[in-house]
């Protein structure tokens, strides 16, 4: 069975708790969109884990997790997160895989993100982690995917500073790289949980544009981020909380301000 968990508001609805609960019955957990700008906080045996890129299912021994094609991967933040898991006794080796079509956040993108937002007449309130710039490069067909890391001709066009940044992570990234659509076909008869990031109102297409994230945070992102057809998504859970909040700028129906 294929089950999707997505935020139905502006994020911070408590998706992590729901994912953690449903992951008990799943063999595989796939995060399908977003990057290090989003995250889930899980408490296990009184210990708090803040996960920004690694799917929450990694906390269950024996579960395999995937970072999908719709994600943008910050290698520095990813391996810091994996080190945190190792330091807390979580054995993740051989259980974390990344789609070869996922794009990579390069150092220059972070600074570009901040400068672009500061230059706007109405700043969006970006996290400054390079997420929007990476998605922009993806749309402009200038991005770097995991699939490109051992493509010599492609990498020859990458700035030396970015090559130097990637060098310490290259071998490990390549060892975690998979064709996720082929993998999903291979495990099609298993229980797979798809973990969303942020929320429907931050979706690039259906959210409160332009005050949105750059990724597909709606349920359709589970299909585009994994290669599974939308008709094969058996259940979709939208997570709400009783009172609405949002981070960053943009409209919110229940907001009070000085003129209210």
Where are these regions (language model features)?
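Non-transmembrane, aqueous-exposed alpha-helical and coiled segments at domain scale
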Residues: 1-260
């Amino acid at each position: 069975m294929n089950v999707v968990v997505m935020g139905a508001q502006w994020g911070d609805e408590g998706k992590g708790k729901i994912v953690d609960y449903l992951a008990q019955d799943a063999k595989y957990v796939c995060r399908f969109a977003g990057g290090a700008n989003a995250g889930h906080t899980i408490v296990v045996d009184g210990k708090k884990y803040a996960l920004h890129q690694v799917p929450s299912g990694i906390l269950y021994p024996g579960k395999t997790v995937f970072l999908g094609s719709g994600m943008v991967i910050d290698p520095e933040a990813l391996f810091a997160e994996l080190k945190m898991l190792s330091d807390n006794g979580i054995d993740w080796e051989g259980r974390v895989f990344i789609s070869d079509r996922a794009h990579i956040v390069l150092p220059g993108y972070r600074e570009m993100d901040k400068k672009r937002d500061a230059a706007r007449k109405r700043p969006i309130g970006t996290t400054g982690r390079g997420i929007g710039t990476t998605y922009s490069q993806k749309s402009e067909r200038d991005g770097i995917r995991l699939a490109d890391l051992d493509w010599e001709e492609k990498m020859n066009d990458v700035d030396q500073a970015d090559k130097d940044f990637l060098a310490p992570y290259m071998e490990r990234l390549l060892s975690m790289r998979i064709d996720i659509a082929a993998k999903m076909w291979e495990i099609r008869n298993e229980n797979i949980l798809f973990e969303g990031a942020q929320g429907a109102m931050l979706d690039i297409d259906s959210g409160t544009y332009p005050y949105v994230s750059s990724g597909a945070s709606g349920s359709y992102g589970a299909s585009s981020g994994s290669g599974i057809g939308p008709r094969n998504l058996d259940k979709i859970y939208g997570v709400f909380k009783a009172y609405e909040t949002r981070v960053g700028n943009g409209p919110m129906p229940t907001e009070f301000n000085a003129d209210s």
